[in-house]
């Protein structure tokens, strides 16, 4: 089940489902400025900007942190989170002066480690992480417009 709250779409299904959000529509200028500002306010630092002919992506560094209670309850003792903000060019918005708009999305990669398999695994059934990511998505979407 999905609901629209503010300018972002959030999944309300429980379980180990990846966190993905629709953020709204941005210009190239406010996309980079707003994303950088909101991520820094939430202790996420940009590691990489990737651009191609149809999209732009901002990728954070891994936020290595103490596991949340839901992660320790599941037997994990190490956790790290990374955010991807993707902006896809809306071709219908091109203008004479090269202006255009982006459709913006956020995806979260949360990895945890238990030591059993000697590798990190994705884990999303973490209420505190979801709350934190909902807050970041809401903060971003408040600075974009919602045309969906």
Where are these regions (language model features)?
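C-terminal motif of bacterial Sec signal peptides marking the signal peptidase cleavage site
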Residues: 3-6
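Ser/Thr-rich, low-complexity intrinsically disordered terminal regions
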Residues: 8-148
């Amino acid at each position: 089940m999905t609901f629209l709250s503010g300018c972002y779409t959030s999944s309300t299904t429980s379980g180990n489902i990846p966190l993905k959000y629709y953020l709204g529509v941005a210009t190239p200028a406010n996309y980079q400025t707003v994303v950088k500002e909101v991520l820094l306010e939430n202790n996420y630092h940009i590691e990489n900007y990737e651009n191609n002919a149809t999209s732009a992506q901002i990728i954070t560094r891994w936020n290595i942190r103490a596991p949340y209670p839901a992660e320790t309850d599941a037997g994990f003792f190490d956790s790290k989170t990374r955010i991807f903000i993707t902006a896809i060019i809306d071709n219908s918005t091109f203008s004479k002066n090269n202006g255009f708009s982006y459709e913006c999305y956020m995806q979260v990669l949360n990895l945890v480690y238990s030591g059993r398999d000697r590798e990190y695994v994705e884990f999303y059934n973490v209420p505190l992480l979801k709350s934190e990511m909902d807050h970041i998505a809401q903060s971003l979407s408040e600075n974009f417009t919602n045309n969906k």
